[in-house]
């Protein structure tokens, strides 16, 4: 048996995206745009096909949403994957500003 792969997630602010790496190889990212009034808009999430089915997308989004929460940022889930994650994990719904929830179907 091989060693467990090393998984690292970080905010790459130069690229405006959170990245997930497996053994130092980029496995996926979620692109965002900072918004005025203390919010972050998630635009697109992508996991490389070689890494699909391992739960990396969910780990990436959980990290990004937890980071937004710790920074006091509201979340605008334009990305369908992020929106779906919030639907499946309603404890994150509070990050979506009340005035924006109807827009996203919440």
Regions found by a protein language model. Name each.
Residues 51, 55-60:
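Conserved acetyl-CoA pyrophosphate-binding loop and the N-cap/start of the following alpha-helix
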Residues 25-33, 41:
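Conserved beta-strand in the GNAT
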Residues 16-27:
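Conserved beta-hairpin
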Residues 59-74:
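Conserved acyl-CoA
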Residues 1-16:
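Active-site rim helix/loop that mediates acceptor-substrate recognition in acyltransferases
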Residues 39-49:
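Conserved acetyl-CoA binding element of GNAT-fold acetyltransferases
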Residues 70-103:
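C-terminal structural segments of small proteins and small subunits
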């Amino acid at each position: 048996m091989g060693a467990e792969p090393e998984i690292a997630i970080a905010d790459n602010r130069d690229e405006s995206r959170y990245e997930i790496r497996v053994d130092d190889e980029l496995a996926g990212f979620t692109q965002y745009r900072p918004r005025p009034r203390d919010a972050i808009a998630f635009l697109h999430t992508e996991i490389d096909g070689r890494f699909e089915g391992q739960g990396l997308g969910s780990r990436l989004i959980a990290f990004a949403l937890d980071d937004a929460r710790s920074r006091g940022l509201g979340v605008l889930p334009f990305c369908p994957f992020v929106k779906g994650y919030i639907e499946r994990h309603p404890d994150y719904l509070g990050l979506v500003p009340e005035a924006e929830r109807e827009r996203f179907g919440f």
